[in-house]
Amino acid sequence: MNNFSIISAYKPAGGQPKAIDEIIAGLNSKKRSQMLLGITGSGKTFTMANIIERTNRPTLIMAHNKTLAAQIYLEMKSIFPKNAVEYFVSYYDYYQPEAYIVRTDTFIEKDSSINEQIDLMRHSATRSLLERRDVIVIASVSCIYGLGAPDLYYQMTVHLELGQSYPRDKLLNDLINLQYKRNDIGFERGCFRVKGDHIDIFPSHYSDKAWRLSFFGNELEYIHEFDPLTGEKLTQLDKAMVFGNSHFVMPQKTINNAISSIEVELQKHLDVLKSQDKLIEAKRLNQRTQYDLEMLTETGSCKGIENYSRFFTGRNAGEPPPTLFEYLPKDALLFLDESHVSIPQIRAMYNSDRARKEVLVEHGFRLPSALDNRPLKFEEWEKFRPQTVFVSATPGPFELEETGGTVVELIIRPTGLLDPECIIKPATNQVEDLISEIQTTITKGLRILVTTLTKKMAEDLTSYLQDLQYKTYYLHSNIHTLERIEILRDLRQGNIDILVGINLLREGIDIPECGLVAILDADKEGFLRSEVSLIQTIGRAARNSRGKVILYADKMTKSIDKAVSETLRRRQIQQEYNKKYGIIPKTINSAIHTLESLEEIHDNKLDKKQTNTLLNNPAKLKSYMDKLKKEMFKAASNLEFEQAAKLRNQLKTLEKAVLELS
C-alpha cells in the first residue's frame, strides 16, 4: 500500500502541531464531524497535509469555487510530489444549460465548451481513486452533480497484460465501446491507431503519454509508454488498464435495457400530456426522445445522454444519482474548505437545478426522468459524506451544530504575525479621514483595500480618488476572472495603490503588501456587515506586520462588537506565543506570480502582452490553441520534432496559465 509522504523544508509550527494532534484524536475516536477554525496565514493547507500524511487515508478536499480549488491543488501538488494529487472541477469553460422561457415561448438549446485539460484531470482523478489509495482529490462543490456510476465505469475497462491473448478485432471493438476513436492520422487524447502488429492508445487521463501494444499473433508481447509527439520510448510496462473516454460509457446490455425503460416512460408520459390536451408538447417530446433512442441504438451515445442517466445506473425515480462520493473508499476523509460559504452553496444547488428542469418536463422537452440528472440534495450529501473536517475562520451555524460548538483552533501563526489592530472611527466625514490614512499608508509603501456598501458609492469613491491622482481601481463583479487576477497582481506590484470593492475583498485574497483595510459604513447591519463578513474582511490585513483595519461607524453594532472582540482575542493569543518563544512578527512575502513564471513563454515567441490578450478572450484563446495543436501535429508528421516540442511547450504554458488563473 502506498503511503503519503510530505516533501517540505518546513515542519509543523505555531498552532499547527496541537491542531493536528486534536483533529487526528477526533478521527481516531470516530467523530464524524470536526471544526478546524483556521485564521488567515495560520497554514491551514499545510495542517491538512500533515493530517492526511499521519492518517494515511484517501482524501477529498472540497472548495467553494474553481479558483480556490486550483490554489489548494497547486499547493498540495508541491507538498505531495510522490502521491496522486488530483483536480476535479466542472470541465466547462462555458455552459448554457437547456431552458425554456414560457413567457416568450423560447427554447434555449444547451451550449457548452469543454476544457480538454480539465476533462483529462477529471478522468485522472477517478482512475486514481479506483487504482490506488494515496490519493488526494481537490474538487469544487460541483462534485455533487451526477457522474457515471463507478461500478459501470470500472466494468468498462480493458485490462492489458503481457503474455495474454487478445483477438485483434475484439480489442479494437472494446476500445470503440469505451468511446475511443480510431484516428490513424491525428493522434490525440481519446484516440487509437493501428499500424501493422502495433496498436497505439492515447489514454483519456494523459496529455503527454501514450501506450504502444506490440503483438505476435494475438499474444501481447510488449507494452511501451511513449511520447505521442516525438515517438520517444519512455518506459516498458507489464500491464495497463484502459478506462473509458467518458464517465458515461456502459456495456451494450445496459444500453439495451435502458432503451426499453425509456420507451416505457415515454409512452406513459405521452399519455399524460395527451390527457391534458398538450398535443404540441406530446409531439415535441416524442420527436426529441425518438431521435435520442435512435442515436443510442446506433452509436451507444446521444446528445444530453446524462438526462437518461437513471436508466443506465438502474436507480429508481427520486434516488440520488452516482457522484464522485461513490468513487471514494469507505475510510476516506473529507475536508470542506471555507465551509461557511460551501455549505450554503451545497444547500442551494438542488433547488435551482430542479426549477429549470420542471419547466422542460412540463412543456415536453424532457422526460420526467431528466429530473434525476441532478446534484445531490443537502440531506443526501449529508448522508454520503465520510468523516469530515470543516475548515473556516468563521464557522457557520451548521458546522457548529454538527460539532456541538466544539472547535479546534488554529490561530497561532508560525510567522508570529498578529491579527491586525482594529480602530473604530466615526462614519461622519469618513472619506476625508480615509484620504488622510491613505496618504500615510502609501508613504510606507503599502497598499489599501476599501470596502463600500453599494456599487454607486464604490464608483463615486473610485472616481474621486482618481481625481486626486491616487492610483485607484474598482473591483466589481463584471470583471472577468483572469482580469481580476491581473488587477490583484498590479496591486501587489504597486501599479495600483488602492482597490475599492463591495463584497470581493474576502476569502482567498492574498495581499501581503496590504497595510490598511478600510470598512466604510461598518455600522449598517446586514449581509455585507455581518460578523462573518467583517472577520473575513479584517483578515485581509493579517499578512502584513504593519497591517491595520479602520471600521467607520457611528454606533457599535453586535456584529462589530463580536468581530473586533474575536480579532482582539486572537491577537492576544499570538502576542503571548510570540513573547514566550521570542518571535518577532514577519510579513509573509509570497511570490508575485507572473505569466512568465508559469513557464518560459518568451522561449516560445509568445510575449506577455499576447498572452494577456488571449487569456482575457476565451474565444480567441480556444482558436489560437487549436491552431497551435494543428501546427504541432503537422511539424511532427514532417519529422520536425524540435519545432513540434516547442509548440507543445507553448500549449502546455497556456493550459497551465488558464488553470492557475481560472
Swiss-Prot record:
Positions of short motif Beta-hairpin = 91-114
Asked if the Swiss-Prot or TrEMBL record annotates the protein with the keyword Cytoplasm, the reply is yes
Name the GO cellular-component terms: cytoplasm; excinuclease repair complex
GO biological-process terms attached to the record: nucleotide-excision repair; SOS response
- Which PROSITE patterns does this UniProt record tie to the protein? HELICASE_ATP_BIND_1, HELICASE_CTER, UVR
Cellular compartments annotated: Cytoplasm
Question: Sorted alphabetically, which Gene3D superfamilies does this protein's record hold?
Answer: P-loop containing nucleotide triphosphate hydrolases, UVR domain
Major localisation: cytoplasm
Q: Which GO terms describe its molecular function?
A: ATP binding; ATP hydrolysis activity; DNA binding; excinuclease ABC activity
Q: Which UniProt keywords apply?
A: ATP-binding, Cytoplasm, DNA damage, DNA excision, DNA repair, Excision nuclease, Nucleotide-binding, SOS response
Q: What is known of its domains?
A: The beta-hairpin motif is involved in DNA binding.
* PANTHER family in alphabetical order: UVRABC SYSTEM PROTEIN B
Q: Which family does the record claim for this protein?
A: Belongs to the UvrB family.
Function, as annotated, reads: The UvrABC repair system catalyzes the recognition and processing of DNA lesions. A damage recognition complex composed of 2 UvrA and 2 UvrB subunits scans DNA for abnormalities. Upon binding of the UvrA(2)B(2) complex to a putative damaged site, the DNA wraps around one UvrB monomer. DNA wrap is dependent on ATP binding by UvrB and probably causes local melting of the DNA helix, facilitating insertion of UvrB beta-hairpin between the DNA strands. Then UvrB probes one DNA strand for the presence of a lesion.
Q: What is this protein called?
A: UvrABC system protein B
